[in-house]
Amino acid sequence: MTSPIHVNSEIGKLKTVLLKRPGKEVENITPDIMYRLLFDDIPYLPTIQKEHDQFAQTLRDNGVEVLYLENLAAEAIDAGDVKEAFLDKMLNESHIKSPQVQAALKDYLISMATLDMVEKIMAGVRTNEIDIKSKALIDVSADDDYPFYMDPMPNLYFTRDPAASMGDGLTINKMTFEARQRESMFMEVIMQHHPRFANQGAQVWRDRDHIDRMEGGDELILSDKVLAIGISQRTSAQSIEELAKVLFANHSGFEKILAIKIPHKHAMMHLDTVFTMIDYDKFTIHPGIQGAGGMVDTYILEPGNNDEIKITHQTDLEKVLRDALEVPELTLIPCGGGDAVVAPREQWNDGSNTLAIAPGVVVTYDRNYVSNENLRQYGIKVIEVPSSELSRGRGGPRCMSMPLVRRKT
């Protein structure tokens, strides 16, 4: 059986990708709650949708099949006849303290067509949408100024993080912050019930019920044998070691994991915000993760004796990559040309977050013009997409895309 998921590199020609078009959840961000929702600004919906549509069309123009999360989730719920079960689980994870409110929300949402229900859950439910008359103390004492019964999920257009394709399977992730933890429920129901994915041979290497955090922006597929995973603000060292044991024990094909330690800060939340693979022997890198002499703490995980994991510490990232990928030479291309001002400015707007759609061909944000021109000087074909509003969410083209199928390199 051929798996519907097949990703054995970061650079193989992209064949199928999962996106989420920004929707009304973006308009439900307010200044009072945007930081808790992990946003630094409020995008303008008509423009962010136009930019995202251009991003999707750019992928289609390059032969990529584009699937949308909201459509797959609704199709899966209907195919599995699990509308009520899915809604119950979503409500239980939405931290609704009042039984009366939860019951009213269930009645409100379950009455909708499935796609409408999915989009409303993603957008969030405001308190003025449902008239709840309750004299229960928990409701009387509720915060009258808070506008939502169910919080919006504006980060959903970053489909890379809730789940990550890996070989002929994927991880469905336990997200770090409460604002994003419900997101991986959509991929869970797709894998369980969608006819294209359920029982079709795709392995779930790690599910969302784990205690330790992991997010797809930290998971890079360097080759059919080697992974790189960031030890970051969003992915723990413990989760990497747990995943290594599963992959090594279950004939995944992966023989080595490079655990790369990066600063635990919002500007560098995932490994792919500071480091991406763009060709067989070329990577982008943000100089801010490198210490003296360009050193980066890297831990090499390999199978050991008696199901143990052998871990080796090195700091010369370039050498580690050369050895792991078995290439004689390798180039780390600095974001913003390594300039002290340009590099952090363009990294903030995801200058390092490139999406390779084929070896040496990348999609980037147009606003990072110094980094883009620098890539061209190294022989990389750069396809720019507009980004004035997309970039406000602090994620780039790689963050906004979850490859499902790549051609083997």
UniProtKB/Swiss-Prot annotation:
Location of the protein in the cell? Cytoplasm
E.C. no: 3.5.3.6
- Root EC class: hydrolase
User: Which GO cellular component terms, listed alphabetically, does the Swiss-Prot or TrEMBL entry include?
Assistant: cytoplasm
**Pathway(s) per entry:** Amino-acid degradation; L-arginine degradation via ADI pathway; carbamoyl phosphate from L-arginine: step 1/2
Superkingdom is: Bacteria
One GO term under biological process is:
arginine deiminase pathway
Catalysis: reaction(s): L-arginine + H2O = L-citrulline + NH4(+)
Q: What is its main location?
A: cytoplasm
Active site positions, chain numbering: C399
One Pfam family here: ADI
Instruction: Tell whether Hydrolase is among the UniProt keywords.
Output: yes
- Molecular function terms from GO: arginine deiminase activity
Q: Where are the transmembrane segments?
A: none
Keywords for this protein: Arginine metabolism, Cytoplasm, Hydrolase
Please give the family membership noted in the entry: Belongs to the arginine deiminase family.
Concerning PANTHER family, the annotation shows:
ARGININE DEIMINASE
- Tell me which HAMAP family the record gives: Arg_deiminase (MF_00242)
Q: What is this protein called?
A: Arginine deiminase
